[in-house]
Amino acid sequence: MEKGYKMNRSSVYRNMFSEKPVRVSSIRRSYTARGNPQGSLIIPSSSRSRVSYVTPISSRSVRLVRSSAPVVASSSNLDFTLVDAMNSEFKVNRTNEKAEMIELNDRLANFLDKVRSLEQQNKMLLAELEQVKGKRPSKIGDLYEQELRELRLQIDQISNEKSRVEVERDNLADDLQKLREKLQDEVIQREDAENNLAAFRQDVDDACLARLDLERKVETLQEEIMFLKKLHEEEIIELQAQIRDSQFKVEMDVVRPDLTAALQDVRSQFDKLASKNIAETEELYKSKLADITDSASRNNDALRLAKQENNEYRRQVQSLTCEIDALKGTNESLERQMQDVEDRYNMETTNAQDTISHLEDEISHLKDEMTRHLQEYQELLTVKMALDVEIATYRKLLEGEENRISMPLPSFGSMSLSDAMFEQQPFENRTSKKKIVIKTVETSGGDVISETTQKIED
């Protein structure tokens, strides 16, 4: 009997304490399954966006049994030492459960603080997202459109100014070509005038030579006239001397009139001839001199006209040269201005393209930042849902533990062998068999990467 009592005692102890963790685990699984409205548990992963779904397949009610071993002696009571051991074990379990409850409460408080901080961050991110969506893009778009309109207006103005400058440049080029043609004509006329002037100078030189020749001839004739006058006077003197020295004595009254008349005739003839020669010489000299003077005056007039034309042509050439230099300076200034306009246009175009690229990069950065905020918001929502589910699960676990702790202990002193035998018969029904399916889904950016399913039997 003592051996049977010991066997019953060990069976009761094993059924009371060794099966307890299994029953508690079963109860926790039941609460876990009932905690989620869909019958699933969402377990978040810290390394990646990972969501696990735990779906119970079959669950049957678990009966709380404190004893399943038969009692040999139905009329005798249980040993009170067993009750003391159970009470001490119960106190230890209560202490452990109290510590576990404190730890769970601390974890729950930490989770609630984390949820509050995440909700505040979520609100801040939502406000920032609304601000970025509502204000920043529209402001950037308006600034972009306004600056683009200003740049287009500047481009149109620069294009119009460039066209005007090109037209002015073409007109100046045409004027310059005309002036060059006119200058060429003037140069040709100048060369012709210089050739005519050279010919006139040759004529003037010839006229001067002819005048000098005539002057020499006039001087020669004048010398010849003077010589003839001297010779005539000497002949007259000789004749007078011969007449005085004559041996013939003739009467002066008879002979003198004849000689005087002859001398007078000779003198008159000689005077006539001399006067005639002088007159002819003077007329010839005057005519030659008049011709030479006329020719010289004509040559002088032609030379003066040629000089005037030459001076006029020189002044025209100088004025045209000055005008060409001025046009060249204007053309160079316009070319520099056009180059400056083109450089400024290219620089403004480059700045506009840089601004457009910067705005596009900023818009792309804002879009990426919005996408990142949305992803963070989605992840935070997922974490919040997981935390809500876990908090609900812990709440259900706490309620279940409180209900289990508040349940009254069975009176071992009044247990009979029949009760023990009655409780031992449905032992197979008390062993709960449960299949748990753990479905793990990995997501990244809202897309499903992988999905795994694991089955566990209890």
Swiss-Prot record:
<feature type="domain" description="IF rod">
    <location>
        <begin position="97"/>
        <end position="405"/>
    </location>
</feature>
<dbReference type="InterPro" id="IPR018039">
    <property type="entry name" value="IF_conserved"/>
</dbReference>
<keyword id="KW-0403">Intermediate filament</keyword>
<dbReference type="GO" id="GO:0005737">
    <property type="term" value="C:cytoplasm"/>
</dbReference>
<dbReference type="GO" id="GO:0005200">
    <property type="term" value="F:structural constituent of cytoskeleton"/>
</dbReference>
<feature type="region of interest" description="Head">
    <location>
        <begin position="1"/>
        <end position="100"/>
    </location>
</feature>
<dbReference type="Pfam" id="PF00038">
    <property type="entry name" value="Filament"/>
</dbReference>
<comment type="similarity">
    <text>Belongs to the intermediate filament family.</text>
</comment>
<dbReference type="GO" id="GO:0005882">
    <property type="term" value="C:intermediate filament"/>
</dbReference>
<keyword id="KW-0175">Coiled coil</keyword>
<dbReference type="InterPro" id="IPR050405">
    <property type="entry name" value="Intermediate_filament"/>
</dbReference>
<dbReference type="InterPro" id="IPR002957">
    <property type="entry name" value="Keratin_I"/>
</dbReference>
<feature type="region of interest" description="Tail">
    <location>
        <begin position="406"/>
        <end position="458"/>
    </location>
</feature>
<dbReference type="InterPro" id="IPR039008">
    <property type="entry name" value="IF_rod_dom"/>
</dbReference>
<dbReference type="GO" id="GO:0045109">
    <property type="term" value="P:intermediate filament organization"/>
</dbReference>
<dbReference type="InterPro" id="IPR006821">
    <property type="entry name" value="Intermed_filament_DNA-bd"/>
</dbReference>
<dbReference type="Pfam" id="PF04732">
    <property type="entry name" value="Filament_head"/>
</dbReference>
<protein>
    <recommendedName>
        <fullName>Type III intermediate filament</fullName>
    </recommendedName>
</protein>
